[in-house]
Amino acid sequence: MSDPALIADGYAAADIRAAEAPLLAAGAQLMRVAAAGLARACRALAPDGPVLVLVGAGNNGGDALLAAAELAREGREVGVIRTAGRIHEAGAAQAVAAGVPITSADELDDATLADIARSSALVVDGILGIGTTDSPALRGEGRRVVAALLPVVTAEGGPAVIACDIPSGVGCDDGAVPDPAVLPADVTVTFGAGKAGLMQGPGRALAGRVELVDVGLDLSGATPLVRAAR
């Protein structure tokens, strides 16, 4: 059986961002395509039950918010916990319009966070993506939330976990995990291209099954850091 993490070549974050740039400049709706793929994976992994979405700043959180809105419009019970003071405005607006409550993590103590996760069928990790420029380790409220949820998601019968693009706390290029506060994903839905960090180092074991959502990136001029088995 092939390694589920090696479904595609793994590229560096800088090459992926460079491939995204011309599409974004041309007005391509990359986030909408990514969010649809994320929502599809959520339905497949957990067809029923409440969904808890963890959202940080930036586009990774935007993908998660748009997916939350899509699931809520279909009738799923969805709640968002934001770990950053500011989150993706358009994504948040769509989530709120779909009836999704957004709660700031600093309003919830650790026991309450654990209780919310325990009552959920699925946790979506949209805290950090590939835009992290230094250490991928979670900090502040993001780290506290993940630390509070870890015993719940790793317990027998705990909720399933989907990572948005890459598990928060995993190095995109090398798979490094400098801090143990990382939610182990059952599925990682990655966008545009495989991330090398999903395919090597400690990150490989935390990624679970990797599903690639094609958003039309041209990486023909980039050299993969990790090559998939052919």
UniProtKB/Swiss-Prot annotation:
The keyword NADP applies. Keywords: Isomerase, Metal-binding, NAD, NADP, Nucleotide-binding, Potassium. Residues 11-223 form the YjeF N-terminal domain. It is an enzyme of class 5 (isomerase). (6S)-NADPHX binds at residues 59-63, 129-137, 165. Its cofactor is K(+). Catalyzes the epimerization of the S- and R-forms of NAD(P)HX, a damaged form of NAD(P)H that is a result of enzymatic or heat-dependent hydration. This is a prerequisite for the S-specific NAD(P)H-hydrate dehydratase to allow the repair of both epimers of NAD(P)HX. Belongs to the NnrE/AIBP family. This is NAD(P)H-hydrate epimerase. It comes from Clavibacter michiganensis subsp. michiganensis (strain NCPPB 382). The gene is nnrE.
